[in-house]
Amino acid sequence: MDKLAVLYAEHIATLQQRTRTICEREGLEGLVIHSGQAKRQFLDDMYYPFKVNPHFKAWLPVLDNPHCWIVVNGSDKPKLIFYRPVDFWHKVPDEPRDFWAEYFDIELLLQPDQVEKLLPYDKANYAYVGEYLEVAQALGFSVMNPEPVLNYFHYHRAYKTQYELECLRNANRIAVDGHKAARDTFFNGGSEFDIQQAYLMATRQSENEMPYGNIVALNENCAILHYTHFEAKAPQQHNSFLIDAGANFNGYAADITRTYDFKKQGEFAELVQAMTAAQIELGTGLKPGMLYGDLHVECHNRVAQILSDFDIVKLPAEEIVERKITSTFFPHGLGHHLGLQVHDMGGFMADEMGAQQAAPEGHPFLRCTRIIEKNQVFTIEPGLYFIDSLLGDLAQTDNKQFINWQKVESFKPYGGIRIEDNIIVHEDSLENMTRNLALD
């Protein structure tokens, strides 16, 4: 039997147990989870690409089929209402026969408006979980997305099953293939558009299948944190390349970033090497029992040391941190949970009731503050950038006297650096899925 199929049985058992626990606690008969609906573009007859409800794809890898429903109570075999219309305009999904199908009682739905007859008749004690509240109300649901239920699932989503970990390994494998192709295209003089196409070709996934919009940036564009344009024309001179791009496997995401210097020599290349070394060391700092926020604080110490070593800031590292200069050059968080969503839910939670884990003082904008525990998956993605707007703000402060502005100007044509790996925390070890696949 396929490895995923074996692991999936334990995954479903875990989801059933979680469902049973929260339904008993909240006095619910069960949950009705909606995959979602296609969204029509304004004043048009075309639709936006469909994105499935993450609570739905936690149960099964059906990512591209709207109007599906799961009815589950944690004790009985889950019921899957699978949308399969008669349609000569579009490709109709095949009847489910994959490894996961045997774990569901499957009923086929021909038309979305016929679903009511397949749902529980009395919905008073069933909770609707999904985006389309007006649909839920029309169907007779009075309990919709109850906060205690969502908090419970979001908290426990951080603890990955073995099936989920295997899916994340596969997502990394696909993404690494794309990264290697993108890297080669950059060193062959390709444009951002060329690099993006090479990435998609190597992953065998379309742009809409990517878990997020790829960031493919050359030169100064590397300073734009979420740069999602693709210049079709190659620059006259290639200086640097930053790629932040992932892949999808069964609904689970990879999220990987690399930065390259075109000449592979000189001070920016050395800066990339220094950031890479810091990133690897920070990754080894993921220890069960520690706060992820503390690792973010340590990242600022590492960035400060690099700013000092390269004479970008003419101060010792300790004083750079004390003066909060690092936030100009490293303005985002160290990373986040990874799973069904790129920025997976539950990163701020202190318990399953929804209490929040406070961020470290002076670092309010993090995506993860949680206690690190085994079977959790994190990204580690330190950065160092030369962003005009932030540098302009810095120039208006007393700290401007400590900045080597000539050095800053020399680095501006390169934009910035970000390095990112995806790491599993085990009880007594770490598994860097990204570097295990030989992506330097």
UniProtKB/Swiss-Prot annotation:
Record flagged with keyword Hydrolase: yes
InterPro entries per the UniProt record, alphabetical: Creatin/AminoP/Spt16_N, Creatinase/aminopeptidase-like, PepQ_N, Pept_M24, Peptidase_M24B_aminopep-P_CS, X-Pro_dipept-like, X_Pro_dipept
One GO CC annotation: cytosol
Entry GO MF terms: aminopeptidase activity; metal ion binding; metalloexopeptidase activity; phosphoric triester hydrolase activity; proline dipeptidase activity
Keywords linked to the UniProt accession: Dipeptidase, Hydrolase, Manganese, Metal-binding, Metalloprotease, Protease
Enzyme Commission designation: 3.4.13.9
UniProt-listed GO biological process terms: proteolysis
This protein's record includes keyword Aminoacyl-tRNA synthetase: no
Residues bound to Mn(2+) 1: D255, H336, E381, E420
Cofactor(s) it depends on: Mn(2+)
Cofactor note: Binds 2 manganese ions per subunit.
Catalytic activity: Xaa-L-Pro dipeptide + H2O = an L-alpha-amino acid + L-proline
PANTHER family, alphabetized: XAA-PRO AMINOPEPTIDASE 3, XAA-PRO DIPEPTIDASE
Family: Belongs to the peptidase M24B family. Bacterial-type prolidase subfamily.
Task of the protein: Splits dipeptides with a prolyl residue in the C-terminal position.
UniProt-recorded name of the protein: Xaa-Pro dipeptidase
Organism of this sequence: Pseudoalteromonas translucida (strain TAC 125)
Designated gene of the protein: pepQ
